[in-house]
Structure formats: C-alpha cells, structure tokens
C-alpha cells in the first residue's frame, strides 16, 4: 500500500493515512515489531498521559515503536529512555563521535539484531 516508508533519519515509519490494515507489513517484519490496532483509541477524562505531539492512531491500522519521533525530532529523548528507572537506555546521534551513545558503542561490545538480513539496524544492545 506504500504506508511503510523510511524517513530521512532512517527510521521505518507508517503513514496512517495510507495504512489499510491489511497486516502484510506485520507478516513481513523480521523483528515481529508490528501490532494491529483492534480498538478505537480511548482517553480517560482528566487523565494526564501520553504526549500531545503523538498522533492518535485509529482502529484498523498497524502500529510500531517510532522511538517517539515527535519528541526526538524536537531534541527530546524517547519516553522509554527518559523514564527508565535503571538508566539502562541511551539515545543519541551515532553520527556524532563525541555523543554518549557513540562512545559507549566504541568502548563496549555492542550487538544488533538481524543485521545479516540487510535491515541496517539502528538499535544497539550493549552489555
């Protein structure tokens, strides 16, 4: 359908206006990282959660982690990084050799998932 695309930063994204919910991308995803949204979005009245910058995804479309692109595009960290109680997640610019994430990648043994499938992963796991 053309709903899945790679943005200028290399992130795999979904255009919700083009997604028809056929789930072909879910079947093709080598990471099994996509889910189908079966329900209408529900927001509890008066509840404070989520990020207003994130578009609401309606029922019948695919979803996946975007590393909080709305936040990272504005220089903020993804919420999982910001909220991790163990500070076990680091987000940064791999093209900047002085960034914390680049230093960690150089100094530690970093692994990626499914690189052999040509996925060009941008998430690194460091021990």
Segments from the language model and where they lie:
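Non-ligating segments of multi-cofactor redox enzymes
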Residues: 1-127
């Amino acid at each position: 359908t053309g709903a899945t695309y790679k943005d200028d930063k290399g992130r795999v994204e979904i255009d919700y206006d083009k997604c028809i919910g056929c789930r072909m991308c879910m079947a093709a995803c080598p990471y099994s990282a996509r889910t189908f949204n079966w329900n209408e979005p529900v927001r509890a009245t008066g509840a404070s959660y989520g990020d207003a910058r994130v578009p609401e995804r309606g029922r019948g479309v695919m979803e996946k982690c975007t590393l909080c692109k709305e936040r990272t595009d504005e220089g903020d960290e993804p919420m999982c990084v910001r909220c991790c109680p163990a500070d076990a997640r680091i987000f940064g610019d791999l093209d900047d050799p002085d960034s914390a994430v680049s230093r960690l990648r150089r100094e530690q043994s970093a692994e990626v998932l499914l690189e052999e499938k040509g996925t060009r992963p941008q998430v690194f796991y460091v021990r």
